[in-house]
Amino acid sequence: MATLTAKNLAKAYKGRRVVEDVSLTVNSGEIVGLLGPNGAGKTTTFYMVVGIVPRDAGNIIIDDDDISLLPLHARARRGIGYLPQEASIFRRLSVYDNLMAVLQIRDDLSAEQREDRANELMEEFHIEHLRDSMGQSLSGGERRRVEIARALAANPKFILLDEPFAGVDPISVIDIKRIIEHLRDSGLGVLITDHNVRETLAVCERAYIVSQGHLIAHGTPTEILQDEHVKRVYLGEDFRL
């Protein structure tokens, strides 16, 4: 089992601390949420783990491998997959070519193995019928499936999902939740940050709540819902799953 650890992360902008001493862990085969009010520091924390935002203090570790100084692309090679909120599909490439764009840079696979892996991913995510479709022609739900399949083409240990429920219709939300559960069941560790707290908590085993740059709660969804501090600053008294 692999473990992704963010330890004592801190970040300041122009002298103002936006993240202070935040720690979290994600294990293989579990779904973890990183949530909080707008401006709480959760997105900055998430981006420090991904490698988009440099941390001022703290460490990012996969098992015993400290990757704190590595850029995003190097972290990807160590096992961190990242799916941004914005559409990241190559619009003028087919679904097949989108997958091969990642598989081609994997020097651990032969040409035949890359072809086999592309076919496996299309079958796994039920996008075989879209093989020759251009990225720009896909629906929101189809695009998300292709983007997740492409992220898995890099063979990550963990996948970090930025706002996976944003900009998709209710049917697609259900579909994405099933995909996230499938990723967990496949042995990946999944970290989600999303403004849709209801859908995120519904799919998580654990969650971390950040407010004003500090970690204020950590636990199961039930524990989070019962936390009085979380109710006061984030969820309110009447929130229910």
UniProtKB/Swiss-Prot annotation:
Q: Which residues cross the membrane?
A: none
The cross-references to InterPro entries, in alphabetical order and at most eight, read: AAA+_ATPase, ABC_AA/LPS_Transport, ABC_transporter-like_ATP-bd, ABC_transporter-like_CS, BCA_ABC_TP_C, LPS_export_LptB, P-loop_NTPase
Cite the GO molecular-function annotations of the record: ATP binding; ATP hydrolysis activity
Top-rank EC class of the record's enzyme: translocase
**First-listed, main subcellular location of the protein, grouped into a coarse class:** cytoplasm
ABC transporter domain span: 4-237
Q: Which is a Gene Ontology cellular component entry for this protein?
A: membrane
Keyword Cell inner membrane listed? The answer is: yes
Q: Which UniProt keywords apply?
A: ATP-binding, Cell inner membrane, Cell membrane, Cytoplasm, Membrane, Nucleotide-binding, Translocase, Transport
Question: SMART domains, from UniProt?
Answer: AAA (SM00382)
Q: How does it sit in the membrane?
A: Peripheral membrane protein
> For binding ATP, which residues are annotated in this chain's numbering?
G36, P37, N38, G39, A40, G41, K42, T43
Q: List the disulfide bonds.
A: none
Q: Which Pfam families match?
A: ABC_tran (PF00005), BCA_ABC_TP_C (PF12399)
Question: Disrupted gene: resulting phenotype?
Answer: Results in an earlier growth arrest and onset of cell lethality.
**Which Gene3D superfamilies does the record match to this protein?**
P-loop containing nucleotide triphosphate hydrolases (3.40.50.300)
Q: What induces it?
A: Transcriptionally regulated by sigma-E factor.
| One Gene Ontology biological process | lipopolysaccharide transport
Keyword Transcription, does the record have it?
no
Q: What is its EC number?
A: 7.5.2.-
Where is this protein found? Answer: Cytoplasm; Cell inner membrane
What is the stated purpose of this protein?
Answer: Part of the ABC transporter complex LptBFG involved in the translocation of lipopolysaccharide (LPS) from the inner membrane to the outer membrane. Probably responsible for energy coupling to the transport system.
Q: Family per UniProt?
A: Belongs to the ABC transporter superfamily. Outer membrane lipopolysaccharide export (TC 1.B.42) family.
Listed under subunit, the entry gives:
Component of the lipopolysaccharide transport and assembly complex. The LptBFG transporter is composed of two ATP-binding proteins (LptB) and two transmembrane proteins (LptF and LptG).
Question: Which NCBIfam families does the UniProt record give?
Answer: LPS_export_lptB, PRK10895.1
The name this protein carries in UniProt is Lipopolysaccharide export system ATP-binding protein LptB
Species whose genome carries this gene = Escherichia coli (strain K12)
- What gene name does this entry carry? lptB
